Amino acid sequence: MIELHAILAATANGCIGKDNALPWPPLKGDLARFKKLTMGKVVIMGRKTYESLPVKLEGRTCIVMTRQALELPGVRDANGAIFVNNVSDAMRFAQEESVGDVAYVIGGAEIFKRLALMITQIELTFVKRLYEGDTYVDLAEMVKDYEQNGMEEHDLHTYFTYRKKELTE
């Protein structure tokens, strides 16, 4: 069975986006870390997150969860992204398309909520400066059943790894 990890950047107030983009300037090393962790993996996201990507995520299989009607689950677009309407189809295609044992949930807020019970690890880039946006997650709720398993401090941000408590005992 494939393991789901969430990867996201957020501020102390839970802000993760504004106008379908990150509300902060690029953080040194953050995109490289995202690429390193997700390269060769399946990434699961919502339609708005997919549409906000500035470029195709090369070397990764994208599964896009959407509320828009689909003729069949698993329809692919010109970039090869797989479109699905529900969690079970997302997980089925993640399992089928995966070349490893981990898939990453990359957003947005609604997708994190829908897959929360299945996520075993969270890779959080904590942005130290406060930003306002239009998309938020409840960080306290998100990590309440997790235990910090790693931390890497930087000037403008800190990387945290959280592992589901039942898996660390």
UniProtKB/Swiss-Prot annotation:
Keywords: Antibiotic resistance, Methotrexate resistance, NADP, One-carbon metabolism, Oxidoreductase, Plasmid, Trimethoprim resistance. InterPro entries: DHFR, DHFR-like_dom_sf, DHFR_CS, DHFR_dom. CDD domains: DHFR (cd00209). It is an enzyme of class 1 (oxidoreductase). One of its GO terms (molecular function) is dihydrofolate reductase activity. Gene3D superfamilies: Dihydrofolate Reductase, subunit A (3.40.430.10). Residues 3-169 form the DHFR domain. The keyword NADP applies. It holds the Pfam family DHFR_1. It catalyses: (6S)-5,6,7,8-tetrahydrofolate + NADP(+) = 7,8-dihydrofolate + NADPH + H(+). GO terms for biological process: dihydrofolate metabolic process; folic acid metabolic process; one-carbon metabolic process; response to antibiotic; response to methotrexate; tetrahydrofolate biosynthetic process. It comes from the Bacteria. The keyword Oxidoreductase applies. Pathway: Cofactor biosynthesis; tetrahydrofolate biosynthesis; 5,6,7,8-tetrahydrofolate from 7,8-dihydrofolate: step 1/1. Its EC number is 1.5.1.3. GO terms for cellular component: cytosol. Confers high-level trimethoprim resistance. Belongs to the dihydrofolate reductase family. Key enzyme in folate metabolism. Catalyzes an essential reaction for de novo glycine and purine synthesis, and for DNA precursor synthesis. Homodimer. This is Dihydrofolate reductase type 8. The lineage of its organism: Bacteria, Pseudomonadati, Pseudomonadota, Gammaproteobacteria, Enterobacterales.
